[in-house]
Amino acid sequence: MTNLEVRTAAQCVENPYLPMRMVIQRITDEVDDRTIKSFDLAFMDEEDARRFRYMPGQFCELSVFGQGEAPFGIASSPTEQGFVRFTVKKAGVVTSKLHSLKPGDIIGMRGPLGNYFPLDLMRGKDVVVIGGGFAFTTLRSLIVYLLEGGERDQYGKIIVIYGARTPGLLMYKEDLAAWEKRDDIQVVQTIDVAVPGWTKKVGFVPNVTEETAPKADNAIAVICGPPIMIRFTLPVMTKLGFQKEQIYTSLENRMKCGIGKCGRCNVGPKYVCLDGPVFSMAELAELPPEY
């Protein structure tokens, strides 16, 4: 590792291909079957730490040396100091290797990359956050930022609807429990099928959304989840009065290089990694139907 070329934040524009070295500070199992883990990373270069700035919705490329790299949405909030968190589902070569690492191991990170959630548009409005399963990662970043960014009074109601197949597949359990105790956010957790001991909602996310979401008169919605969940939730949002310009989502599949060079995430005139990953449904309606 000692001969690895180190990228500092000052070199970002000159050479976006070089990763910054990050040390794994903490690893947390997020679900009962241990297939999803959160990695809290700390900067090894103080200048990198000083200059690194990101917003909810952005992503980074994480690299395991000798194995490859892959894009991951940032799960921490800019308001959380001392670490950058990524939640990783074990699926392929890079993610499997990440899951085998331990605190103290070193990996690479490029970023932050892409755009972010429309925080300016959310000011003065109710914010509805709808998530399903593993796709709750960048939504956690958004929620923590709205609550802890020092401007909670700039937003209206914050309503979070989060669903998974079983209780054991709901991530960020400590966060969810803490949010439920607050009076400035409404958290609705739901699972697909009732199980013994579960006292919260039972039902699919689209149905729970119809029961819970506010009127669309002064609201912005952010939806992230499996494609089938989004597909059945969108008609519900339309029924509630939400226009396409009021609904945002994040596209992360197909991205590879993160900087618009490989062309893998190209859709019509857009590159998901450059023009996104956050898009309004109005923007997506103008694109070819690849997504």
Set out the residue ranges of the language-model regions.
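Ferredoxin-reductase
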Residues: 6-105, 164-166
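Non-catalytic, surface-exposed connector residues within folded enzymatic/regulatory domains
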Residues: 18, 51-54, 154, 170, ...
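Local cysteine-cluster metal-coordination motifs and their immediate loop/turn environment
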Residues: 228, 252-277
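FNR/FR-type flavoprotein reductase catalytic core
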Residues: 2, 93-256
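Short microdomains enriched in Cys/His and/or Lys/Arg
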Residues: 130, 279-291
